From Swiss-Prot:
Keywords: Lipoyl. The modification N6-lipoyllysine is found at K62. The glycine cleavage system catalyzes the degradation of glycine. The H protein shuttles the methylamine group of glycine from the P protein to the T protein. It comes from Vibrio parahaemolyticus serotype O3:K6 (strain RIMD 2210633). The keyword rRNA-binding does not apply. This is Glycine cleavage system H protein. SUPFAM superfamilies: Single hybrid motif. The glycine cleavage system is composed of four proteins: P, T, L and H. Its cofactor is (R)-lipoate. It holds the Pfam family GCV_H. GO terms for biological process: glycine decarboxylation via glycine cleavage system. InterPro entries: Biotin_lipoyl, GCV_H, GCV_H/Fam206, GCV_H_sub, Single_hybrid_motif.
């Protein structure tokens, strides 16, 4: 796992791209709990997302799960490959399976997220 990632309690990850944007996806743990992903409902570019609010839905053979934004900002890019290949979330949750890129409204929100070590400790307790 990439040690520079930040995580939420609801199993989303965030990668700071260093240019005022972040990439968001779901963790390996989350995709394992969901099982085989069959559909991802992506937001639109220019949609506003709010920290803690649902912005996407991932459907798997087991369940449909809301995806919550870890940060507030504007969607600047969506992973269009997920429309035809939603299984990328299972195969490459931290690389090809990213969901959106968001331009941050408040970069300090990143400070509220867990680092990789804190996140791994929290899922071991589940």
């Amino acid at each position: 796992m990439d040690k520079t990632l930040k995580f939420t309690d609801s199993h989303e990850w965030v990668r700071d791209n260093g240019d005022g944007t972040v990439t968001i996806g779901i963790s390996e743990h989350a995709q394992e709990m969901l099982g085989d992903v069959v559909f991802v409902d992506l937001p639109d570019v220019e949609d506003e997302v709010e920290a803690g609010e649902s912005f996407s839905l991932v459907e798997s053979v087991k369940a449909a799960s809301d995806i919550y934004s870890p940060v507030t900002g504007e969607v600047v890019e969506i992973n269009e490959e997920l429309e035809d290949s939603p299984e990328l979330i299972n195969e490459e949750p931290y690389e090809g399976g990213w969901i959106v890129k968001v331009k941050l409204s408040d970069p300090s929100e990143l400070d509220d997220l867990k680092d990789a070590e804190e996140y791994l400790s929290s899922i071991e307790e589940e």
